[in-house]
Amino acid sequence: MTERRQPSLSTDTLPTREAAAIELLSQVCRELDSIVFATSLGAEDMVLTEIIRRERLPIRIFTLDTGRLPTETLELIEVVERHYGTRIERYAPHPDAIADYVSRYGLDGFYDSVPARQACCRVRKLEPLKRALAGQSAWVTGLRAEQSVTRAELPAREWDAANGLEKINPLADWSEHEVWAFIRHHRVPYNPLHNQGYPSIGCAPCTRAITVGEDVRAGRWWWENPETKECGLHRREFAPRQPSAHPAIERDRSAA
């Protein structure tokens, strides 16, 4: 796998960042039961997969198989399972819900309007996520504050009122450079699309490569304004952390 090129910057902060992420996850595991990690197999999520498996943390890993993921992402799931000797659970949309969406909007109707795109995300992502989070105490994400304007005020730990559980963001204050320095240092597997100009990878028809100078999430739903570019998985409807109840428009992509 070709190494992704990164700026020549100091990595002095990386050990501190890594230790803080490990401590946060370890603390959450001491306090709560039934913790899950939602991975999209992006670079940040590969950092967390490495930490969770290396530290043997009791955190179950799952992904949302939307039915429209790039081939490279699907192949990476198998690579990760072999590399870490673990299983990534897959949650898929209900076929009837997909059929209803296609009947109303068309297979690629998400290009036509923000409501149509949000409806697709609800069917392919939000409903499967609800099933994955049911009965859990907390979920872990690879979100970083610098990724977009919708994530600028991201805390490391918060109460997810929409889903009724804690949400843990161990990489909230990490930079993109720190993420890639970690991947290089620990030889973590990652999606080859990152080497082709895709810093953020979602469903194949909704992701494009970015050009020099563009925001890291510019390739996600690129036909929309930045303020609407969230699928709803991480919408900002959060309350202060609650006390624990537990003890202790191009439609063709050449790369997909």
From Swiss-Prot:
Subcellular location(s) of the protein? Cytoplasm
Q: Which reaction does it catalyse?
A: [thioredoxin]-disulfide + sulfite + AMP + 2 H(+) = adenosine 5'-phosphosulfate + [thioredoxin]-dithiol
The note on cofactor binding and number reads: Binds 1 [4Fe-4S] cluster per subunit.
Entry function: Catalyzes the formation of sulfite from adenosine 5'-phosphosulfate (APS) using thioredoxin as an electron donor.
Q: Which residues form the active site?
A: 231
Please give the family membership noted in the entry.
Belongs to the PAPS reductase family. CysH subfamily.
Q: In this record, what's one Pfam family?
A: PAPS_reduct
Chain sites annotated for binding [4Fe-4S] cluster: 120-121, 203, 206
The coding gene here is cysH
What protein name applies here?
Adenosine 5'-phosphosulfate reductase
Coiled-coil annotated residue ranges, if any = none
Q: Does the keyword tRNA-binding apply?
A: no
Keywords, ordered alphabetically: Cytoplasm, Iron, Iron-sulfur, Metal-binding, Oxidoreductase
Question: Which EC number applies?
Answer: 1.8.4.10
Q: Which cofactor does it need?
A: [4Fe-4S] cluster
Chief location bin: cytoplasm
> Which pathway does the database say it acts in?
Sulfur metabolism; hydrogen sulfide biosynthesis; sulfite from sulfate
Q: Which GO terms describe its cellular component?
A: cytoplasm
One function term, GO molecular function aspect: adenylyl-sulfate reductase (thioredoxin) activity
Q: Which GO terms describe its biological process?
A: cysteine biosynthetic process; hydrogen sulfide biosynthetic process; sulfate assimilation, phosphoadenylyl sulfate reduction by phosphoadenylyl-sulfate reductase (thioredoxin)
